[in-house]
Amino acid sequence: MNQNKCTGSESPLGLTRRNFLNRFGGGLGGLALANMLHAESGTGLHHPAKAKRVIYLFQSGGPSQIDLFDHKPRLTKETGKELPDSIRKGQRLTGMSGNQASLPLVGSPFKFSQHGKSGQWISELLPNTAKIADDMCIVNSMYTEAINHGPGVTFMQTGSQLPGRPSMGAWLSYGLGSLNENLPDFVTLVTKNKSGQPLVSRLWGSGFLPGKHAGTRFQSNKDAILYLNRPDGVSRGSRRSVLDGLKELHKIQLERTGDEALETRIAQYEMGFRMQSSIPDVTDISKEPKSTFDLYGEDAKNPGTFAANCLQARRLAEKDVRFIQLYHQGWDQHGNLPGGIKKQCKETDRASYALVHDLKQRGLLDDTLVIWGGEFGRTNYCQGKFNSSNFGRDHHPRNFSTWFAGGGVKP
Protein backbone atom coordinates (compact mmCIF):
# COMPACT_ATOMS: atom_id res chain seq x y z
CA MET A 1 0.00 0.00 0.00
CA ASN A 2 1.17 3.50 -0.80
CA GLN A 3 0.84 5.24 2.57
CA ASN A 4 0.94 8.68 0.98
CA LYS A 5 -2.39 7.95 -0.71
CA CYS A 6 -4.13 6.99 2.52
CA THR A 7 -6.40 9.55 4.08
CA GLY A 8 -8.58 9.66 7.16
CA SER A 9 -8.53 7.36 10.14
CA GLU A 10 -7.89 4.29 7.92
CA SER A 11 -4.36 5.52 7.23
CA PRO A 12 -1.67 3.48 9.02
CA LEU A 13 -0.18 6.82 10.03
CA GLY A 14 -3.54 8.26 11.13
CA LEU A 15 -2.83 11.43 9.19
CA THR A 16 -6.13 13.18 9.42
CA ARG A 17 -5.70 16.60 10.99
CA ARG A 18 -7.33 15.45 14.24
CA ASN A 19 -5.54 12.09 14.50
CA PHE A 20 -2.23 13.65 13.53
CA LEU A 21 -2.40 16.23 16.32
CA ASN A 22 -3.67 13.66 18.83
CA ARG A 23 -0.81 11.30 18.06
CA PHE A 24 1.94 13.89 17.99
CA GLY A 25 0.54 16.25 20.61
CA GLY A 26 2.16 14.48 23.57
CA GLY A 27 5.36 16.52 23.33
CA LEU A 28 6.01 20.23 22.93
CA GLY A 29 5.80 19.70 19.18
CA GLY A 30 2.03 19.52 19.59
CA LEU A 31 1.95 23.15 20.71
CA ALA A 32 4.25 24.37 17.99
CA LEU A 33 2.62 22.28 15.27
CA ALA A 34 -0.97 23.15 16.12
CA ASN A 35 -0.04 26.83 16.19
CA MET A 36 1.58 26.72 12.77
CA LEU A 37 -1.05 24.53 11.14
CA HIS A 38 -3.74 26.99 12.18
CA ALA A 39 -1.64 29.81 10.78
CA GLU A 40 -1.67 28.27 7.30
CA SER A 41 -5.01 26.51 7.23
CA GLY A 42 -6.88 29.43 5.74
CA THR A 43 -10.01 28.62 7.72
CA GLY A 44 -10.88 32.23 8.45
CA LEU A 45 -10.33 32.04 12.20
CA HIS A 46 -11.18 35.14 14.21
CA HIS A 47 -7.68 35.11 15.70
CA PRO A 48 -5.40 33.09 13.41
CA ALA A 49 -2.10 31.97 14.92
CA LYS A 50 0.96 33.88 13.81
CA ALA A 51 3.88 31.45 14.05
CA LYS A 52 5.63 30.55 10.81
CA ARG A 53 8.77 29.09 12.33
CA VAL A 54 10.07 27.66 15.62
CA ILE A 55 13.37 28.09 17.47
CA TYR A 56 13.68 25.46 20.21
CA LEU A 57 16.43 26.13 22.77
CA PHE A 58 16.54 22.66 24.31
CA GLN A 59 18.37 22.49 27.65
CA SER A 60 19.41 18.86 27.94
CA GLY A 61 19.79 17.33 31.39
CA GLY A 62 16.80 18.74 33.22
CA PRO A 63 17.23 22.33 34.48
CA SER A 64 16.17 22.88 38.08
CA GLN A 65 12.88 24.77 37.96
CA ILE A 66 13.15 25.47 41.70
CA ASP A 67 16.33 27.48 41.17
CA LEU A 68 15.31 29.30 37.97
CA PHE A 69 11.60 30.04 37.54
CA ASP A 70 9.41 28.28 40.12
CA HIS A 71 9.67 30.44 43.23
CA LYS A 72 9.11 28.37 46.41
CA PRO A 73 9.61 30.56 49.52
CA ARG A 74 7.92 27.99 51.77
CA LEU A 75 10.38 25.35 50.59
CA THR A 76 13.26 27.61 51.58
CA LYS A 77 11.81 27.92 55.09
CA GLU A 78 11.45 24.14 55.33
CA THR A 79 15.03 23.43 54.21
CA GLY A 80 16.53 20.55 56.17
CA LYS A 81 13.21 19.00 57.16
CA GLU A 82 12.25 15.55 55.91
CA LEU A 83 10.06 15.20 52.83
CA PRO A 84 6.63 14.29 54.26
CA ASP A 85 5.48 10.71 53.72
CA SER A 86 2.18 12.08 52.41
CA ILE A 87 4.06 13.60 49.49
CA ARG A 88 6.62 10.85 49.00
CA LYS A 89 4.03 8.06 48.93
CA GLY A 90 3.48 6.75 45.41
CA GLN A 91 6.11 9.01 43.85
CA ARG A 92 8.36 7.37 41.32
CA LEU A 93 12.01 7.92 42.27
CA THR A 94 15.19 7.03 40.42
CA GLY A 95 17.65 4.47 41.72
CA MET A 96 20.03 7.32 42.52
CA SER A 97 17.94 8.65 45.42
CA GLY A 98 15.13 6.13 45.84
CA ASN A 99 17.13 4.12 48.37
CA GLN A 100 18.14 7.08 50.52
CA ALA A 101 17.12 6.68 54.15
CA SER A 102 16.50 10.41 54.33
CA LEU A 103 15.11 12.87 51.78
CA PRO A 104 15.73 16.32 53.28
CA LEU A 105 13.97 19.26 51.65
CA VAL A 106 16.23 21.94 50.21
CA GLY A 107 15.07 25.32 48.95
CA SER A 108 16.88 27.44 46.43
CA PRO A 109 19.90 29.35 47.76
CA PHE A 110 19.32 31.95 45.05
CA LYS A 111 17.18 35.05 45.36
CA PHE A 112 14.02 35.52 43.31
CA SER A 113 12.35 38.78 42.34
CA GLN A 114 9.45 39.87 40.16
CA HIS A 115 10.10 41.41 36.76
CA GLY A 116 8.24 43.43 34.16
CA LYS A 117 4.64 44.54 34.18
CA SER A 118 3.69 40.87 34.31
CA GLY A 119 5.48 40.46 37.65
CA GLN A 120 6.98 37.10 36.73
CA TRP A 121 9.26 35.52 39.33
CA ILE A 122 12.74 34.87 37.96
CA SER A 123 15.93 33.84 39.74
CA GLU A 124 18.94 36.10 40.17
CA LEU A 125 20.80 33.55 38.04
CA LEU A 126 19.01 34.90 34.95
CA PRO A 127 19.36 38.71 35.02
CA ASN A 128 19.24 39.02 31.23
CA THR A 129 16.32 36.66 30.72
CA ALA A 130 14.46 38.74 33.31
CA LYS A 131 14.60 41.70 30.89
CA ILE A 132 12.21 39.90 28.52
CA ALA A 133 9.74 38.88 31.25
CA ASP A 134 6.89 40.64 29.44
CA ASP A 135 7.65 38.75 26.22
CA MET A 136 7.64 35.34 27.90
CA CYS A 137 5.02 32.87 29.04
CA ILE A 138 6.62 30.78 31.80
CA VAL A 139 4.83 27.47 32.34
CA ASN A 140 5.75 26.03 35.75
CA SER A 141 3.38 23.07 35.51
CA MET A 142 5.05 20.98 32.82
CA TYR A 143 4.69 17.22 33.32
CA THR A 144 6.11 14.07 31.77
CA GLU A 145 6.01 10.32 32.41
CA ALA A 146 9.72 9.91 31.64
CA ILE A 147 12.11 9.84 34.58
CA ASN A 148 15.37 9.11 32.72
CA HIS A 149 17.16 11.23 30.16
CA GLY A 150 16.96 9.03 27.06
CA PRO A 151 13.18 8.51 27.09
CA GLY A 152 12.64 12.05 28.40
CA VAL A 153 14.54 13.80 25.63
CA THR A 154 13.04 11.48 23.01
CA PHE A 155 9.53 12.26 24.27
CA MET A 156 10.05 16.03 24.16
CA GLN A 157 11.40 15.81 20.61
CA THR A 158 9.03 13.25 19.11
CA GLY A 159 5.97 12.91 21.36
CA SER A 160 6.92 9.32 22.25
CA GLN A 161 9.40 7.81 24.70
CA LEU A 162 10.11 5.03 22.20
CA PRO A 163 12.69 5.73 19.48
CA GLY A 164 11.77 5.64 15.82
CA ARG A 165 9.11 8.35 15.64
CA PRO A 166 9.59 11.51 13.55
CA SER A 167 10.92 14.53 15.41
CA MET A 168 8.77 17.65 15.60
CA GLY A 169 10.93 19.48 13.06
CA ALA A 170 10.43 16.61 10.62
CA TRP A 171 6.66 16.75 11.13
CA LEU A 172 6.62 20.48 10.45
CA SER A 173 8.66 19.99 7.29
CA TYR A 174 6.35 17.19 6.17
CA GLY A 175 3.12 18.96 7.04
CA LEU A 176 3.88 22.53 6.04
CA GLY A 177 6.62 22.37 3.46
CA SER A 178 9.38 24.86 2.83
CA LEU A 179 9.48 28.63 3.15
CA ASN A 180 12.90 28.78 1.46
CA GLU A 181 13.76 26.14 -1.14
CA ASN A 182 17.46 26.99 -0.92
CA LEU A 183 17.83 25.95 2.73
CA PRO A 184 16.71 22.93 4.77
CA ASP A 185 13.33 23.16 6.47
CA PHE A 186 14.90 21.85 9.68
CA VAL A 187 18.35 22.72 11.09
CA THR A 188 20.02 21.42 14.27
CA LEU A 189 22.87 23.09 16.18
CA VAL A 190 24.60 21.53 19.22
CA THR A 191 26.79 23.45 21.66
CA LYS A 192 30.33 22.12 21.36
CA ASN A 193 32.47 20.70 24.19
CA LYS A 194 29.56 19.93 26.51
CA SER A 195 29.08 16.67 28.38
CA GLY A 196 26.00 14.81 29.49
CA GLN A 197 23.49 12.40 28.05
CA PRO A 198 24.43 11.64 24.42
CA LEU A 199 22.48 13.51 21.76
CA VAL A 200 21.86 11.05 18.95
CA SER A 201 20.77 11.88 15.41
CA ARG A 202 17.37 10.19 15.78
CA LEU A 203 16.35 13.15 17.97
CA TRP A 204 16.23 15.22 14.77
CA GLY A 205 15.44 12.29 12.50
CA SER A 206 12.46 11.73 10.23
CA GLY A 207 11.41 8.34 11.63
CA PHE A 208 8.97 6.71 9.22
CA LEU A 209 8.63 9.91 7.17
CA PRO A 210 10.76 10.40 4.04
CA GLY A 211 14.39 11.13 4.89
CA LYS A 212 14.31 14.57 3.29
CA HIS A 213 12.35 15.83 6.31
CA ALA A 214 15.12 14.98 8.81
CA GLY A 215 17.08 17.78 10.43
CA THR A 216 20.35 18.96 8.90
CA ARG A 217 23.01 19.31 11.58
CA PHE A 218 25.29 22.32 11.23
CA GLN A 219 28.86 21.73 12.38
CA SER A 220 30.77 24.20 14.54
CA ASN A 221 33.82 24.37 12.26
CA LYS A 222 34.28 26.50 9.15
CA ASP A 223 32.32 24.02 7.03
CA ALA A 224 28.82 24.09 8.51
CA ILE A 225 27.79 21.06 6.45
CA LEU A 226 30.27 18.29 5.75
CA TYR A 227 31.25 17.60 2.13
CA LEU A 228 29.13 20.45 0.81
CA ASN A 229 31.91 22.39 -0.92
CA ARG A 230 32.90 21.49 -4.48
CA PRO A 231 36.32 19.85 -4.94
CA ASP A 232 39.04 22.02 -6.43
CA GLY A 233 38.81 22.18 -10.20
CA VAL A 234 35.13 21.26 -10.37
CA SER A 235 32.95 24.07 -11.72
CA ARG A 236 29.36 24.70 -10.73
CA GLY A 237 28.31 24.01 -14.32
CA SER A 238 29.97 20.60 -14.42
CA ARG A 239 28.45 19.68 -11.06
CA ARG A 240 25.03 20.69 -12.44
CA SER A 241 25.53 18.39 -15.43
CA VAL A 242 26.47 15.46 -13.19
CA LEU A 243 23.41 16.00 -11.00
CA ASP A 244 21.13 16.20 -14.02
CA GLY A 245 22.50 12.87 -15.22
CA LEU A 246 22.02 11.27 -11.81
CA LYS A 247 18.50 12.64 -11.64
CA GLU A 248 17.56 10.98 -14.92
CA LEU A 249 19.05 7.65 -13.79
CA HIS A 250 17.15 7.83 -10.51
CA LYS A 251 13.91 8.59 -12.35
CA ILE A 252 14.36 5.49 -14.49
CA GLN A 253 15.01 3.38 -11.41
CA LEU A 254 12.04 4.95 -9.62
CA GLU A 255 9.70 4.01 -12.47
CA ARG A 256 10.98 0.44 -12.34
CA THR A 257 10.95 -0.10 -8.58
CA GLY A 258 8.63 2.51 -7.07
CA ASP A 259 11.21 2.97 -4.30
CA GLU A 260 10.29 6.27 -2.63
CA ALA A 261 13.79 6.51 -1.13
CA LEU A 262 14.96 7.47 -4.61
CA GLU A 263 12.78 10.58 -4.53
CA THR A 264 14.38 11.54 -1.23
CA ARG A 265 17.84 11.00 -2.68
CA ILE A 266 17.07 13.21 -5.68
CA ALA A 267 15.70 15.93 -3.40
CA GLN A 268 18.78 15.76 -1.18
CA TYR A 269 21.15 16.07 -4.12
CA GLU A 270 19.25 19.10 -5.39
CA MET A 271 19.20 20.71 -1.95
CA GLY A 272 22.93 20.13 -1.58
CA PHE A 273 23.57 21.85 -4.89
CA ARG A 274 21.51 24.88 -3.93
CA MET A 275 23.10 25.06 -0.48
CA GLN A 276 26.54 25.46 -2.03
CA SER A 277 25.45 29.03 -2.70
CA SER A 278 23.02 29.67 0.17
CA ILE A 279 24.92 28.28 3.18
CA PRO A 280 27.94 30.62 3.06
CA ASP A 281 25.57 33.59 3.06
CA VAL A 282 23.87 32.30 6.21
CA THR A 283 26.91 31.20 8.19
CA ASP A 284 29.28 34.10 7.45
CA ILE A 285 28.96 36.51 10.39
CA SER A 286 31.86 38.74 9.36
CA LYS A 287 29.48 41.49 8.24
CA GLU A 288 27.52 41.55 11.50
CA PRO A 289 27.88 45.01 13.11
CA LYS A 290 29.49 45.63 16.48
CA SER A 291 26.03 46.11 17.99
CA THR A 292 25.28 42.43 17.34
CA PHE A 293 28.15 41.29 19.54
CA ASP A 294 27.39 43.95 22.11
CA LEU A 295 24.03 42.21 22.39
CA TYR A 296 24.99 38.53 22.20
CA GLY A 297 28.44 38.88 23.77
CA GLU A 298 31.91 38.20 22.41
CA ASP A 299 31.27 34.47 22.81
CA ALA A 300 29.03 34.70 19.75
CA LYS A 301 32.19 35.02 17.65
CA ASN A 302 33.30 31.57 18.79
CA PRO A 303 31.66 28.91 16.55
CA GLY A 304 29.80 26.20 18.41
CA THR A 305 29.10 28.15 21.59
CA PHE A 306 25.51 28.59 22.70
CA ALA A 307 25.79 32.31 21.95
CA ALA A 308 27.08 31.64 18.43
CA ASN A 309 24.29 29.14 17.84
CA CYS A 310 21.67 31.64 19.03
CA LEU A 311 23.04 34.20 16.58
CA GLN A 312 22.98 31.55 13.87
CA ALA A 313 19.37 30.77 14.79
CA ARG A 314 18.42 34.40 14.24
CA ARG A 315 20.13 34.40 10.84
CA LEU A 316 18.34 31.18 9.87
CA ALA A 317 15.02 32.64 11.00
CA GLU A 318 15.67 35.64 8.76
CA LYS A 319 16.02 33.18 5.88
CA ASP A 320 12.71 31.50 6.79
CA VAL A 321 14.00 28.14 7.98
CA ARG A 322 10.94 26.40 9.46
CA PHE A 323 12.41 24.71 12.52
CA ILE A 324 15.69 25.60 14.22
CA GLN A 325 16.73 23.25 17.01
CA LEU A 326 19.48 24.11 19.50
CA TYR A 327 20.79 21.65 22.08
CA HIS A 328 22.77 22.69 25.17
CA GLN A 329 23.89 19.98 27.57
CA GLY A 330 25.11 20.14 31.17
CA TRP A 331 21.97 20.67 33.29
CA ASP A 332 22.07 17.27 35.04
CA GLN A 333 23.17 18.46 38.49
CA HIS A 334 22.97 15.46 40.81
CA GLY A 335 25.70 17.10 42.89
CA ASN A 336 27.19 20.57 43.33
CA LEU A 337 24.06 22.18 41.93
CA PRO A 338 24.84 25.71 43.18
CA GLY A 339 28.11 25.80 41.25
CA GLY A 340 26.96 23.84 38.23
CA ILE A 341 23.78 25.79 37.59
CA LYS A 342 25.65 29.09 37.85
CA LYS A 343 27.96 27.93 35.06
CA GLN A 344 25.04 26.83 32.89
CA CYS A 345 23.21 30.12 33.34
CA LYS A 346 26.35 32.10 32.55
CA GLU A 347 26.59 30.22 29.25
CA THR A 348 22.93 30.58 28.24
CA ASP A 349 21.28 33.57 29.95
CA ARG A 350 22.63 36.42 27.85
CA ALA A 351 22.26 34.66 24.51
CA SER A 352 18.69 33.51 25.23
CA TYR A 353 17.72 37.08 26.04
CA ALA A 354 19.64 38.43 23.05
CA LEU A 355 17.88 36.10 20.63
CA VAL A 356 14.39 37.09 21.74
CA HIS A 357 15.31 40.79 21.87
CA ASP A 358 16.98 40.62 18.45
CA LEU A 359 14.02 38.88 16.84
CA LYS A 360 11.71 41.49 18.33
CA GLN A 361 13.71 44.49 17.13
CA ARG A 362 13.83 43.00 13.63
CA GLY A 363 10.08 42.37 13.51
CA LEU A 364 10.51 38.59 13.51
CA LEU A 365 9.25 37.70 16.98
CA ASP A 366 5.57 37.98 16.09
CA ASP A 367 5.81 35.04 13.68
CA THR A 368 8.60 33.08 15.39
CA LEU A 369 7.85 30.84 18.38
CA VAL A 370 10.83 30.51 20.74
CA ILE A 371 10.82 27.63 23.25
CA TRP A 372 13.26 27.18 26.17
CA GLY A 373 13.22 24.06 28.35
CA GLY A 374 14.47 20.56 29.10
CA GLU A 375 13.13 17.02 29.43
CA PHE A 376 12.08 17.16 33.11
CA GLY A 377 12.75 19.05 36.34
CA ARG A 378 14.59 18.43 39.60
CA THR A 379 13.43 17.27 43.03
CA ASN A 380 12.65 19.53 45.97
CA TYR A 381 14.76 17.29 48.19
CA CYS A 382 18.50 16.79 48.37
CA GLN A 383 20.16 13.92 46.55
CA GLY A 384 22.90 12.43 48.68
CA LYS A 385 24.19 13.86 51.93
CA PHE A 386 22.46 17.08 52.94
CA ASN A 387 24.48 20.27 52.70
CA SER A 388 22.56 23.50 52.18
CA SER A 389 25.43 25.13 50.28
CA ASN A 390 26.56 22.17 48.17
CA PHE A 391 23.82 19.74 47.19
CA GLY A 392 22.28 17.98 44.23
CA ARG A 393 18.76 17.36 42.99
CA ASP A 394 17.47 14.17 41.37
CA HIS A 395 15.21 13.89 38.31
CA HIS A 396 11.60 14.99 38.78
CA PRO A 397 9.16 14.31 35.92
CA ARG A 398 6.00 15.59 37.60
CA ASN A 399 6.92 19.25 37.59
CA PHE A 400 9.25 21.42 35.54
CA SER A 401 9.40 24.78 33.80
CA THR A 402 9.43 25.81 30.15
CA TRP A 403 9.10 29.28 28.71
CA PHE A 404 7.73 30.41 25.38
CA ALA A 405 8.10 33.72 23.56
CA GLY A 406 6.86 35.10 20.26
CA GLY A 407 4.34 33.62 17.87
CA GLY A 408 1.48 35.41 19.61
CA VAL A 409 2.44 34.11 23.07
CA LYS A 410 1.74 36.44 26.00
CA PRO A 411 2.81 36.33 29.68
Predicted region positions:
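Ligand-binding pockets and gating/stacking loops
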Residues: 2-411
